[in-house]
UniProtKB/Swiss-Prot annotation:
It comes from the Bacteria. This is Glutamate--tRNA ligase. Keywords: Aminoacyl-tRNA synthetase, ATP-binding, Cytoplasm, Ligase, Metal-binding, Nucleotide-binding, Protein biosynthesis, Zinc. The lineage of its organism: Bacteria, Bacillati, Chloroflexota, Dehalococcoidia, Dehalococcoidales. GO terms for biological process: glutamyl-tRNA aminoacylation. Monomer. Binds 1 zinc ion per subunit. A motif ('HIGH' region) lies at residues 11-21. It is an enzyme of class 6 (ligase). Signal peptide: none annotated. It comes from Dehalococcoides mccartyi (strain CBDB1). It catalyses: tRNA(Glu) + L-glutamate + ATP = L-glutamyl-tRNA(Glu) + AMP + diphosphate. One of its GO terms (cellular component) is cytosol. Zn(2+) binds at C108, C110, C135, D137. Belongs to the class-I aminoacyl-tRNA synthetase family. Glutamate--tRNA ligase type 1 subfamily.
Length: 487
């Protein structure tokens, strides 16, 4: 093993990557970048029965979306490839047969039916389920359907120092003679990960806490194969708000679902970094560069992290507000295109969207909220109850007169910008003996069809003179058609 820091993210394509899985990838990436080391991606595709088509692509898409670039792995290559375990099968068989030849592993001929019955009987007797080692000393050879099991030492302990949890000790007698090579010639996770971590010169293994009980098995394999083991660090679990294991019932779990829901990659990197790590007890917003600079295992918690959806939304809103109008518009376009009102408006283009985004940037927490906040700035097909044009303290006649006066004042403006509009419309309210809010409210409804909308005059400036005057004229027509009220 070299002195260089080399870490790996080794997902199994048995499903689409969830946030806990990607958090592990990110901690490995941060550790590598902080230490000037290498981040390797290895696809552990040896479980053929549970293999999910498209999962590898989803894994790589998630990494690319978050900017977790890898130094070796799929699409990159490297000196220690191939980086798909299904392409490394001869290495695992060679290691397994070496262990058999040295008396450290053995062929097991027990059928699946026999093993199922064994497990049922053990459970009935309230014993821990496990293999009874009946083939351990029989000296059996290879045959169809046989597996290779590792010979666990029957006494003693296996201890190691976890870089997060400190000294950890396991009794060997409580370990099972686990399978290392299956009957189909594919290795189990235990053998494949050990063989590959050694072959790829992995210096540190940062993985989820759920793999902690497997560590003694791996250390025994390292010793039996004559390898030097890497250093281990087991990351804390991620729990839902109710402190149960994070699952679909808490909301989205697939990383790509968060992308589709309108979360920014910057947000996800920042947020996931705080699920088990903290720089101090108060700082919550970090740039990517700061995370790389500050990240260290000494500040990774031993206790489970709680996934807080409200905090995620808050953080995403904060990041949205830091974007330039151009950047936000580029990111918003795919979401706006999905809204039929906007798509059919004839106004959806990048230049126009750059003007729209500052109007709603402060209100959005996710990109998928943008369309609902601004569709009426694109679409002229706005409908509303004309009664909304009448302030509750005014009559229809007063409101109609006010709208006509405002329309005439706006039409006469030499410059149709927000400052000029406010400069002329605010005094008009006084002339009409109205409060500014009353006149502004009428204009807001007339120009947007909404009672709650982005800043009025800035919105009207983006709409432009022609569209604004047309919308106000339509409002006057609608109001005129209502029965007259008498005060």
């Amino acid at each position: 093993m070299t002195n260089e820091v080399r870490v790996r993210y080794a997902p199994s394509p048995t499903g689409y990557p969830h946030l806990g899985n990607i958090r592990t990838a990110m901690f490995n990436w941060l550790f590598a970048r902080h230490n000037g080391g290498k981040f390797i991606v290895r696809i552990e595709d040896t479980d053929r029965e549970r293999y999910v088509e498209g999962a590898v692509e989803s894994i790589l898409e998630s990494l690319n979306w978050l900017g977790l670039d890898w130094d070796e792995g799929p699409d990159k290559g490297g000196d220690y490839g191939p980086y798909y375990q299904s392409e490394r099968l001869p290495l695992y068989r060679k290691a397994a047969e070496k262990l058999v030849a040295e008396g450290k592993a053995y062929y097991c001929h027990c059928s699946s039916e026999k093993l199922d019955k064994m497990r049922e009987d053990q459970i009935a007797r309230k014993e821990p389920p496990g293999y009874d080692r009946c083939c351990r000393d029989m000296g059996l050879g290879q045959k169809e359907g046989a597996v290779i099991r590792f010979k666990i030492p029957l006494d003693g302990q296996t201890a190691f120092t976890d870089l997060i949890r400190g000294e950890v000790t396991f009794d060997n007698a409580k370990q099972d003679d686990f399978v290392i090579l299956k009957s189909d010639g594919f290795p189990t996770y235990h053998l494949a990960s050990v063989v590959d971590d050694h072959a790829m010169q992995i210096s540190h293994v940062l993985r989820a806490e759920e793999w902690l009980p497997s560590t003694p098995k791996h250390l025994m394999l390292y010793k039996a194969l004559g390898y030097t083991p890497p250093l281990y660090a087991h990351l804390p679990m991620i729990l839902g708000p109710d402190r149960s294991k994070l699952s679909k019932r808490h909301g989205a779990t697939s990383t790509i679902e968060y992308k589709q829901a309108g979360y920014l990659p910057e947000t996800m990197v920042n947020f996931l970094s705080l699920l088990g790590w903290a720089y101090d007890d108060k700082t919550e917003l970090f740039s990517r560069e700061q995370l790389i600079e500050y990240f260290c295992l000494e500040k990774v918690s031993k206790t489970a992290a709680i996934f807080n959806y409200e905090k995620l939304d808050w953080m995403n809103g904060m990041y949205i507000r830091t974007l330039s109008a151009q950047d936000l518009a580029c990111r918003a376009m795919p979401f706006l295109e999905k809204d039929v009102r906007i798509a059919a408006s004839g106004h959806l283009n990048l230049d126009y969207t750059v003007k729209v985004m500052p109007l709603i940037q402060e209100r959005a927490k996710k990109l998928n909220e943008l369309a609902e906040l601004c569709w009426f700035i694109y679409s002229d097909d706005i409908s509303y109850d004309p009664a909304l044009l009448i302030d509750k303290k005014l009559t229809k006649e007063t409101s109609l007169s006010a709208l006509k006066a405002a329309n005439a004042r706006l039409e006469a403006l030499p410059n149709f910008d927000a400052a000029s509009m406010e400069e002329h419309i605010r005094p008009l309210a006084a002339e009409l003996e109205l409060k500014p809010g009353q006149l502004f409210g009428m204009l807001r409804t007339a120009s947007t069809g909404q009672q709650v909308a982005p800043p009025l005059f800035q919105t009207m400036e983006v709409l432009g003179r022609q569209r604004c005057l047309w919308r106000i004229a339509m409002a006057i027509a609608r109001l005129s058609e209502m029965p007259f009220q008498r005060s």
